[in-house]
């Protein structure tokens, strides 16, 4: 009989679409974060339900050949769910997940081609969104711990461009130097709620968006000075006065530049505002669009909508 707190030796059979290892125990599926297919581990049960179990890793007794050393300084943020899995194996996992999804809707005979991967799956994101919180040391800027609103500082990130990380540090330093209050989500007080940065990978243009609770922004000139030696194209104050988890409000105030940046997908140029949707992985967006164009077999005489 499974009981919370009891430990069991298990074999991991597969990965879920959320990146959790899945085994079986007491005729029920058992889900454990951080384990890979083919691994054996000692696991402690943390949740017992009639139809499933959850556990946490106690000891990895037999690692997978596809397990790679941890490269991330922010292991608790939950942003890279299959981080321990070697990249070629991640691509195979994605292919199998698509195949499985098709099978579930009666399309199992559909051919799923191998996933087109990146040359280097690091520092590829063109957008970063950070939460801002106060601490005894002053303002902290980072990510939320998985399944919580606890803040983890983000002094580095393997999938973000290094300029995002530097902008994070500059804004945090400005807030600490001038004692600018971070947003308190319980009391709904403070000044700075969030920081968002965007980079045009082809244009090189850089956007900084500071999300504030109200229209007041103290030490504005000092913020501009703190960013002056970085290639910031535009700086925008976004005002979000609502008690909500939504990051951006509807009102923008441009402090530097035009309030937008530009970037290209193939030969098409896009104007990107703080509220714009734009694919976060620009190099793979090019790959995706190229493959779509290849499959369309266009001759140049068509009108495409």
Identify the function of each model-found stretch.
Residues 1-305:
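Accessory RNA-recognition modules of RNA-modification enzymes
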């Amino acid at each position: 009989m499974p009981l919370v707190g009891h430990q069991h030796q298990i074999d991991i059979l597969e990965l879920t679409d959320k990146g959790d290892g899945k085994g079986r125990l007491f005729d029920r599926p058992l889900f454990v974060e951080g384990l890979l297919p083919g691994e054996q581990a000692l696991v402690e049960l943390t949740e017992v339900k009639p139809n499933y179990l959850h556990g946490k890793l106690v000891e990895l007794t037999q690692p997978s050949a596809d397990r790679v050393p941890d490269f991330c300084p922010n292991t608790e943020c939950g942003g890279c769910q299959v981080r321990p899995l070697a990249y070629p194996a991640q691509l195979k996992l994605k292919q199998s997940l698509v195949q499985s999804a098709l099978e579930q809707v009666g399309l199992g005979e559909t051919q799923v081609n191998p996933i087109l991967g990146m040359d280097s799956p690091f520092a590829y994101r063109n957008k970063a969104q950070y939460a801002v919180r106060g601490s005894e040391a002053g303002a902290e800027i980072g990510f939320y711990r998985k399944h919580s609103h606890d803040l983890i500082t983000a002094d580095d990130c393997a999938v973000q461009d290094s300029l995002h990380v530097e902008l994070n540090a500059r804004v945090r330093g400005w807030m600490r130097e001038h004692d600018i209050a971070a947003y308190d989500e319980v009391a709904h007080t403070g000044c700075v709620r969030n920081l968002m940065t965007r980079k045009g990978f082809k244009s090189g243009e850089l956007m900084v968006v500071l999300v504030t609770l109200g229209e007041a922004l103290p030490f504005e000139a000092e913020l501009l000075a703190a960013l002056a030696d970085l290639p910031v194209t535009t700086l925008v104050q976004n005002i979000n006065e609502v008690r909500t988890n939504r990051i951006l409000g509807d009102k923008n105030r441009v402090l530097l530049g035009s309030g937008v940046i530009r970037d290209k997908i193939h030969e098409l140029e896009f104007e990107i505002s703080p509220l714009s949707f734009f694919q976060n992985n620009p190099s793979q967006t090019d790959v995706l669009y190229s493959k779509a164009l290849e499959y369309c077999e266009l001759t140049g005489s068509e009108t495409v909508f």
